[in-house]
C-alpha cells in the first residue's frame, strides 16, 4: 500500500501543510459561482469541490502513486545536519515548556509556543529553500529577546549559564539562517 495525500503539498513545512488545505477551501469557496456551493463546501466530504471550480481551477492530483515523483529539494548534508540539530533543540525546548507549563501564565506559555512554532517554520523553510526562513528566524530572535527582557534575563526559570547558552543558540541560529 501507498500512504500519503492525493494532492501533493510540495513542502517540508508543517505549518504551511496545516494551513494549505484551509487556504484551498477558502479559495474554492471564493471562486464558486453558486452561493449554495460557497456554503456547502464547508460541510462536504474531504476532496469535494464545486464542479465549476474544479473545471476552472484544476488541482494537481496523484492518480497513480507508483509514478508519483517524490518531493526533493536537493539539500546539502550541512543543511540536513543543521535541521536535525534544530529539531533536537526545539524538542528539548518543548520538553522544558511542558515541565514548567503549570508555573507560567497562559499568555507566557502561548508566547513560548510561538517561539517553538517560529523555530520549526524557519528550519523547514530552509529545507524548502525559501528566503522567508530568515525573516521567521529574525522574528523568533526578536520575540526571544523581548521575553528575556520581560523576565529579567531569565528564560522561563532558566538562569545563569543556561540563559547565556540559549542566547548563544538564538544568535547562531539567526546568523546561520542568514548564511
Name each model-derived stretch.
Residues 70-179:
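Substrate-recognition/cap regions that form aromatic- and gly/pro-loop-enriched pockets
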